[in-house]
Regions:
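Generic recognition of short, well-ordered alpha-helical segments
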Residues: 81-85, 113-116, 168, 197
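Electropositive phosphate-/nucleotide-binding environments in soluble metabolic enzymes
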Residues: 46, 112, 163
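A glycine- and small/hydrophobic-rich beta-loop-beta segment
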Residues: 91, 95-98, 106-127
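A beta-strand-loop signature enriched in Asp, Gly, Thr, and Trp
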Residues: 73-87, 118, 132, 154-155, ...
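C-terminal-of-GTPase-core extension/linker across diverse P-loop GTPases
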Residues: 1-39, 109, 120-240
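Conserved D-loop-proximal element of ABC-family nucleotide-binding domains
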Residues: 78-81, 109-112, 144
Length: 240
């Protein structure tokens, strides 16, 4: 567990922003969902392993918290051993992600079995600590309008094709990220400008304003980094 936390920490340092990974059974609609959420045009095909490499797009929450949305290879039951190494890089995206979005095919009669497979694969990979957001996709194709969402309690009901429910998913992602990342305003007098070089690399600067006494710097960064800075330099570096 500690090793996985360290890997995620290094991944955040490399990307500078949190990572949200779309995972799910093959053909659940992950690539279509990524396209709908980001306005991109990732290749979409109704076949096994249409997505072999991890594809990522940078977007923001309504609160201006940036994150990488990553599309991963679709899982299947009894993945052939010979293919595991080929998929290792994209599977590792799930392990290193800060939040997992599990995309389920609401139009499939085997949704429960497919969901169980995804949960088992995530467990096998060691991706067990991250918060998870359950999604039931293809609500425009449900044969049982009321039944499908009930198979996975608390799941977001949406259609990656039509866009229905996308706003709720964005809100759920933002809620999870706010537990880890948030905008913080630092108040730095002229004699503490040396801290700017330490703060900037930790997150994304969304505003900086010079005053008569120094600089007010607003950065989206991990709560853990904020707490570490406050512990080292005192609460006076925070506005308010």
């Amino acid at each position: 567990m500690e090793k996985q936390r360290e890997l995620r920490r290094k991944s955040r340092e490399k990307n500078e922003i949190p990572v949200v990974a779309l995972v799910g059974y093959t053909n659940a609609g992950k690539s279509t969902l990524l396209n709908q959420m980001t306005g991109s045009d990732v290749y979409v095909q109704d076949q096994l392993f249409a997505t072999l490499d991890a594809v990522s797009r940078r977007i923001e929450t309504a609160e201006h918290t940036p994150f990488l949305l990553v599309d991963t290879v679709g899982f299947i039951r009894k993945l052939p051993h010979a293919l595991v190494s080929a998929f290792r890089s994209t599977l590792e995206e799930a392990v290193l992600a800060d939040v997992l979005v599990i995309v389920n095919d609401g139009a499939s009669e085997e949704i429960t079995q497919q969901h169980d497979t995804v949960v088992q694969v995530l467990s096998d990979l060691g991706a067990t600590e991250q918060p998870r957001i359950e999604v039931i996709n293809k609500c425009d194709l449900y044969t049982d309008e009321a039944g499908a969402p009930m198979l996975i309690p608390g799941a977001v009901r949406l259609s990656a094709k039509t866009g229905e429910g996308i706003a709720e998913l964005h809100a759920r992602i933002a809620e999870q990220l706010q537990k880890t990342y948030a905008p913080v305003t630092f108040v730095l007098p002229f004699d503490r400008f040396g801290l700017v070089g330490q703060i900037r690399p930790l997150g994304r600067v969304i505003n900086e304003e010079y005053t008569d006494t120094g600089l007010e710097l607003t950065v989206v960064l991990a709560n853990a980094d904020r707490d570490r800075l406050v512990s080292k330099y005192g609460k006076e570096i925070l506005k308010g």
